[in-house]
């Protein structure tokens, strides 16, 4: 199993998923931890099996959740593109104000199992 953690998008030295997965054995599972769920297609193109992201807080406050839903292909929850699976957690934390209105915080337990060949 490969577990890849990516630098934040604000880091100018952030490597592409293609760079991070180059040379890995594609027969082994590739898991990516990427704070922001931008450009989900990159994980699919890089042969990533599962990506876990957060960052969005699902908008945290209504009506910002409507805007966040438009900003991201998936602002929260499970998603699949081709063979790549994604989960974007709305998290338990907050940003700015100490409240959430119209969105749910969450913690996620993910069970991983072997591939069915």
Protein language model regions, located:
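Soluble catalytic domains of enzymes that build or remodel membrane lipids, polysaccharides, and related
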Residues: 1-117
């Amino acid at each position: 199993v490969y577990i890849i953690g990516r630098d934040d998008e604000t880091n100018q030295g952030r490597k592409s998923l293609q760079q991070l997965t180059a040379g890995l054995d594609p027969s082994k599972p590739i898991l990516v931890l990427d704070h922001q769920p931008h450009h989900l297609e990159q994980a699919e193109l890089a042969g990533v099996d599962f990506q876990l992201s957060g960052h969005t807080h699902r908008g945290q406050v209504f009506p910002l959740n409507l805007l966040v839903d438009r900003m991201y292909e998936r602002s929260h929850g499970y998603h699949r593109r081709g063979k790549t699976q994604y989960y974007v957690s709305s998290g338990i934390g907050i940003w700015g104000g100490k409240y959430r209105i119209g969105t749910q915080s969450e913690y996620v337990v993910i069970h991983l199992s072997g591939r069915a060949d």
